[in-house]
From Swiss-Prot:
Species name: Dictyostelium discoideum
Keywords: 4Fe-4S, Chaperone, Heme, Iron, Iron-sulfur, Metal-binding, Mitochondrion, S-adenosyl-L-methionine, Transit peptide
GO annotation (BP), single: porphyrin-containing compound biosynthetic process
PANTHER family cross-referenced by the UniProt entry: COPROPORPHYRINIGEN III OXIDASE, RADICAL S-ADENOSYL METHIONINE DOMAIN-CONTAINING PROTEIN 1, MITOCHONDRIAL
Further facts: Might carry two S-adenosyl-L-methionine binding sites with only one binding to the iron-sulfur cluster.
Gene Ontology CC annotation, any one: mitochondrion
Residues where S-adenosyl-L-methionine 2 binds: G95, T96, Q159, R171, D195
UniProt protein name: Radical S-adenosyl methionine domain-containing protein 1, mitochondrial
Domain Radical SAM core: 15-277
Recorded superkingdom: Eukaryota
Keyword Nucleus found: no
Length: 446
């Protein structure tokens, strides 16, 4: 859908900038609280307790969404059509958003419908909720989120189906609870995804992972979605500190590069053999209909509004005036991290912010064409479809691949079997995707 709309805009040579109103927008709602802090997680998270002010959090989320749309999107005349653009996906992430009161997200949904009257009916919007397998009274909780919030897709944080590895990962559920949660979710929803982490330590063998993965995909019964991640050691996490631990008891030794590569190859092979096609480095779906619309919008460099402590946003506008020559402009927004400070800022005064001026609450960063291009490569090359030239040219105001890329390096990487440059797109091969982080710096001209 995005590429078709972008193509139409380009063919019209930017005439009638209101074609942008057809570009989808995703809404990300961040709930920062968790019952336990996982040792590998570097997200903005805080320990859940009875001191969490649910009512204030609820009002703050709605107020921020309202403020973003009214004071940022609608502050400039050229963007006054923004309310006509559809919200196509909503993602309740965290943290652990299922710990929030259902009334909180009901209020968020009602605010969204008021601000975006041209959005699809709530039944047609992909609405995802992240849930932990050991959530109390899971079945009834999911029923209520489905009935009152409109959730139609569930993402389960399974992470492993081996009890000792769940303990290592700091998870609070066990294998039986993980299996039961998948069954409960599948009985209630047509769209269910769950996460697994592999390449955990040097001790994990190919055969162990093969058996676990096959077992997991059998639980999915050939229908749905799975996200299969390698364990990463992010700075600031407990696991990162344990990499350099001097004591054998706490030190973690990750698999070497060759072992990690072999585990990745096995993952892709086994998943596809069981009917799950890879469409992004870590994402596998049993059909096109099961692909995650929300994340696809990220990877295709669509617009998204992030509300909640630490949430990020991206906004694309078309400056319909002589000074800017009807050029595309893209902006980055980043929220305050700490929930208390975030709520205080939101509730202490009217937030006066402008999409083109940095604000003390919600700093706005205008992205250059080259920054947009780099972000498009980092996101788009994660996918099997790659980066479409038409989208790239549209988002960067006319840049082509040869203007932005080191074409000599591109040619070398093509010959080595890591990269494919076609007249209409740039994409990585299977071997190339394993080396994404090292390939990107090589092919950038600047």
């Amino acid at each position: 859908m995005i590429n078709k709309i972008v193509k139409n805009v380009i063919e019209n040579q930017f005439k009638g900038y209101n074609k942008l109103k057809d570009l989808p927008i995703s809404l990300f709602v961040y709930w920062p609280y968790c019952s336990k802090i996982c040792p590998y997680c570097n997200f903005n998270k805080y320990r859940d307790s009875d001191k969490v002010d649910h009512e204030r959090m609820s009002k703050s989320l709605s107020r921020e969404l309202e403020s973003f749309v009214k004071n940022i999107y609608l502050n400039s005349n050229e963007n006054s059509f923004i309310r006509e653009r559809p919200i196509t996906s909503i993602y309740f992430g965290g943290g652990t958003p299922s710990l929030a009161k259902i009334s909180t997200f009901v209020e968020t949904i009602e605010t969204m419908k008021k601000l975006f009257p041209s959005s699809l009916s709530i039944e047609d919007i992909e609405i995802t909720l992240e849930v932990n397998p050991d959530q109390k009274d899971l079945k009834n909780l999911l029923k209520d989120f489905k009935k009152y919030v409109g959730v139609n897709r569930v993402s389960l944080g399974v992470q492993s189906l081996v009890d000792k590895d769940l303990h290592f990962l700091g998870r609070t559920h066990n294998r039986i609870q993980a299996e039961e949660s998948i069954k409960i979710a599948r009985d209630l929803f047509d769209h269910v995804t769950f996460d697994l982490i592999y390449s955990r330590t040097i001790d994990q063998t190919l055969e162990q992972w093969r058996n676990e993965l096959r077992y997991a995909l059998n639980l999915a019964d050939g229908n749905g979605h799975v996200s299969l991640y390698t364990l990463t050691f992010e700075q600031g996490t407990s696991f990162y500190r344990r990499l350099s631990s001097k004591g054998n008891k706490f030190k973690i030794i990750p698999p070497d590069d060759q072992k990690s590569s072999d585990l990745y190859d096995l993952t892709v092979c086994e998943a596809e053999a069981m009917g799950f096609q890879q469409y992004e480095i870590s994402s596998f779906a049993s059909s096109h209909n099961q692909k995650g619309k929300h994340n696809l919008n990220y990877w295709r460099s669509g617009d998204f509004i992030g509300i909640g402590p630490g949430a990020s946003s991206r906004l694309t506008t078309l400056n319909n005036n002589n000074n800017n020559n009807n050029q595309i402009s893209r902006y980055s927004f980043k929220n305050i991290l700490h929930p208390k400070e975030w709520m205080e800022k939101l509730n202490s005064k009217e937030i006066l912010c402008n999409a083109f001026i940095e604000d003390e609450f919600n700093p706005t960063i205008p992205l250059t064409n080259f920054e947009v291009a780099e972000e498009m490569l980092l996101n788009g090359l994660r996918t099997i479809e790659g980066v479409q030239l038409s989208t790239f040219t549209f988002q960067t105001n006319g840049l082509t691949f040869d203007q932005f890329l080191n074409m000599k390096q591109v040619e070398i990487l093509q010959e080595q079997g890591f990269l494919i440059l076609e007249p209409t797109c740039l994409k990585l091969t299977g071997n190339g995707r394993k080396l994404l982080d090292t390939i990107i710096p090589k092919i950038l001209k600047y």
